[in-house]
């Protein structure tokens, strides 16, 4: 059984739900980038700001905002592994639907956080689902559209995430939050839950995964010898890939992320989300161009040029 057993309608459906899934994942990323004000208001509500001068208060806000960034990265990394393994075991479609429901429900629970520590814990757990959305969505699309160049499919999903970031930033620019309304951003982040339910109920599983699962079930005598990227001959290239992946992460999260709180300090309330919108537009264009370049000149050359930029 292969992807030819899927009708064109089923494959379009898979592409659509994967696109929407990572669109909502992008909104969650935008939320993480613009969550500094939520920390500020929670610090005030919880009484943590008592007896602090302005400089000490700003340092405390920045500290917890930095913790939120770390919570997102570690949570998404762990979620990619956990839900990726889950996708191998129970199917891409089910793992994708569960991951979307997971981060939607936990984002809703963040509405009830009473202080920055509670928010950090809830957001870390939510980010497990965000991290799980990417590998299962990409795997599902790659298996359903295997005859289409993978850079093109990855580009479409990557663009979805950046469109989600842009959309969230646009909403925050038009409707800045205050002490009375900041919890609404968590309600907004929960609107993706119905998509997860739709995926579980109506989207077919990848025939490629089904056939590989059947093959594994019929020959499970050498289970310990199953392929792993952390075993030879893949181990070396895996660590090279991990090392190369740190380049955009250092630029995107280690450096750029701090522009947003700095913008909040020196500019209007709309400046930070406007900057995030600009970054998202550039990323959307970059995702599209990267697919074209990768197909024409090769993936390695494309990645080298991307890292230079």
List the predicted regions and their residue ranges:
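Extracytoplasmic
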Residues: 13-50, 251-260
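Extracytoplasmic gate region of multi-pass secondary transporters
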Residues: 32-34, 234-287
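Extracellular/periplasmic helix-loop-helix junction of adjacent transmembrane segments
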Residues: 33-78
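Helix-to-loop junctions at the C-terminal end of transmembrane segments
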Residues: 80-91, 287-299
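Helix-breaking motifs and short loop linkers at transmembrane-helix boundaries and internal kinks
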Residues: 91, 112-118, 146, 298
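C-terminal ends and interior cores of transmembrane alpha-helices
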Residues: 101-114, 308-309
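Cytoplasmic helix-loop-helix junction between adjacent transmembrane helices
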Residues: 122-159
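Glycine-rich segments within core transmembrane alpha-helices of 12-TM secondary carriers
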Residues: 149-177, 192
């Amino acid at each position: 059984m292969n992807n030819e057993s899927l009708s064109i309608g089923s494959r379009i459906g898979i592409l659509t739900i994967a696109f929407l899934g990572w669109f909502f994942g992008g909104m969650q990323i935008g939320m993480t980038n613009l969550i500094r004000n939520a920390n500020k208001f929670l610090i005030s509500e919880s009484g943590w700001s008592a007896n602090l001068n302005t400089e000490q208060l700003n340092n405390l806000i920045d500290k917890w905002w930095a913790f939120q960034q770390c919570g997102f990265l570690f949570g998404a990394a762990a979620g990619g592994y956990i839900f990726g393994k889950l996708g191998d075991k129970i199917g891409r479609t089910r793992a994708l639907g569960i991951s979307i429901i997971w981060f939607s429900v936990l984002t809703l629970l963040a509405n009830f956080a009473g202080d920055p520590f509670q928010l950090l814990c809830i957001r870390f757990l939510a980010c497990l689902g965000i991290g799980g959305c990417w590998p299962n969505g990409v795997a599902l699309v790659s298996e359903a559209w295997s005859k289409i160049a993978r850079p093109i499919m990855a580009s479409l999903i990557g663009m979805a995430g950046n469109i989600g970031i842009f959309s969230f930033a646009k909403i925050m620019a038009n409707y800045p939050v205050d002490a009375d309304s900041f919890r609404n951003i968590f309600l907004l982040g929960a609107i993706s839950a119905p998509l997860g339910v739709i995926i579980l109920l109506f989207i077919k599983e990848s025939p490629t995964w089904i056939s590989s699962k059947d093959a594994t079930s019929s020959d499970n005598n050498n289970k310990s010898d199953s392929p792993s990227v952390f075993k030879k001959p893949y181990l070396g290239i895996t660590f090279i890939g991990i090392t190369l992946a740190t380049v955009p992460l250092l630029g995107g999260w280690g450096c750029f992320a701090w522009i947003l709180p700095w913008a909040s300090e020196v500019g209007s309330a709309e400046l930070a989300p406007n900057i995030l919108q600009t970054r998202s537009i550039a990323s959307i264009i970059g995702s599209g161009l990267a697919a074209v370049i990768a197909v024409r000149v090769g993936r390695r050359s494309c990645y080298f040029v991307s890292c230079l930029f």
